[in-house]
Each structure stands twice: as structure tokens, then as C-alpha cells.
């Protein structure tokens, strides 16, 4: 009964790609910034080979890694969550999704206001924590929705949970998702609920993503069609618009995501458990919080022995990322165009350096290979 546990450490890039300058990300390195250029607090990741990966030049790594490891190259034209996860799952995007550096067109907003019955505030790129400081009071007074974007292909809606109930906010997001198609088909519509009063507001964990559907079948669809279990943990369900999953569960942050992963390790299933740990990106990368990022990575490292102990003889653990978000890159709080790591551990898997791969899609191809399923997706198995 083969099982694959694929964990995405959301935003853990390991160094700028050659074309990073085209994205404004030259010199970024999330792993180096988050660790302070030291592997001292990550003994389990070090032992597995994270710091032996091509291009990770600030650590000597370990002499005898316990896992197989590789540097992954993003072939798609993008650096966001949707594009990154799609490519991991075997879909390469030749064109970037639309972005709105000057805000959304009036035609989109008018239709959104008509269908939701609410006005709109902001409509420009903004930091998620700053936008509720700037517009929170006016939103509470008027009930108008705070609509904003970023350097990524996102339409974000912030609303106070006591002004706009969560289910209404989620319905407003579904309305926006239906409007934002074709030329305005953004990667994600994101619900950003918050609480607080009088200019002192904080975002809650009740975020939801409403993603564009993948343009073709991913490894999830292939596995489901083959009769395998396909389990999504965290925002995996939202990223893939629910497609290809047989079961899913949301999480309230990294600790909850790790707990749910441990729970699935104890369960009998045959197929894939696909986990996204979002705190690295949402709480620390975007906020330039180096210390927070480092602590979160340490917490994950400390959880690895229990994860590995619970693995069965034919289980495969894969650890990767979907893009970068360098907390030390003060020119921006946006995602960064970086290589990502792949660390693979199995009791029957030979450790060693798998070099630099041409696409994230090799991960999806490897998952299919490990589960003895054939499918028409991009990428080549590393096994």
C-alpha cells in the first residue's frame, strides 16, 4: 500500500534563478535570509541533505546525507502560489497570469459592486497588513469591501468579521471568481478576514483562496482517475479549485498542518497526501520577519523525526517549495523568483544528489512513478 507525503514549505526558495532580474528579484535567497546563513538550528534538514543542494553555498552540508535531494527550476513564467503548485503537479504555464499594478479596471469593479451590493475601497497594490490599517476604520463605518492586489495575480478582499460575516465574504469571493475569467482570469481570489477596532486590526486564520481551475489535468486528476486516494491538507483544495481530491482538510497554520500530517501517517490509505504549510509565506516572508521565518523552520525541523518514525516501509516523503519570499529582501514584500529544494526520504530510497532539475513538474512525475500510475503530465521522474 504505497503512500507519498508531499509537503510544500510555502515560499522556501533557495536562491535567485538566472532570470530573477526580470522579475525584480535579483540576489534573493529565502533560505539564506531565514537561516542567517547558518545550518545550526536545522539538524534534521541538514542530515537529510537540504544544505548539500546545488547552489546552497553558505553551508558545508553533511558528509553522508540520509535523503535524496535536488535543486528545482521553475519553468513556468511566474512566481506565485498557483503557478508554482500547478507546475509541481505537472502543468507548466507558458504565459504569466494577469497582474494589476494600477488596480483593477472599472468595468470589473462595477460588476463586482452590482452583484455584491457593496462598495469598494482601495483598489491598488498594498501590503495585506498595511491595507487594513489604512482602510479598516472606513470599512467598519461604511461596510465597503477593501479590494486590493499585489505583484502576484490576486484579487484580495479584506473585511472585518463583525461587519461582513465570513460566509458572506466567501460568497463575495465566489462572485469575484465568476467575474474574473478570460483576460482578467487572475490566479486567485482571496478572502482576507480581520478583527480589531480603531485602527488596530489583525488578520485571522479564516483566509480562503478561490483559485482559477488548472487548464488541464494535473497529477491529482490522474491519481484520482486511477483510483488512488488524493488528500489535500491546508490550502491545497483551494489552490486546485477542489479538482482531483478525494479528501481534504483545512488547517489553522503550520502547527495544525503538521499535526494533521501526523494523523494521516497513522491512517490506512493508498495514494498521495499533499500538504501546504503556509505560515512561512503568509506570516513571515511577506512581512520581512526573518526571526519568525527561522523559528517556523526550526519547528518544522523538530517535527521531522516523528514524521519519519511514523513512515511505513514503502512510504515516500517529499519536501519542496512553490516559490521564494525572501524575508531579508527589503526592496519588496512580494514573492521572489527562486530555485526551490526537493528533499526525498524513504526507508528503501537511496540517498544522494539528483542535481538541478529543469522543472518543478519532475515532482509530479515522481509521485506518479512512486505510486505506479501512468499519466500525461509534464516532467520526468527522478526515481
Predicted regions and their residues:
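Feature captures the catalytic ectodomains and active-site-proximal regions of enzymes
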Residues: 1-383
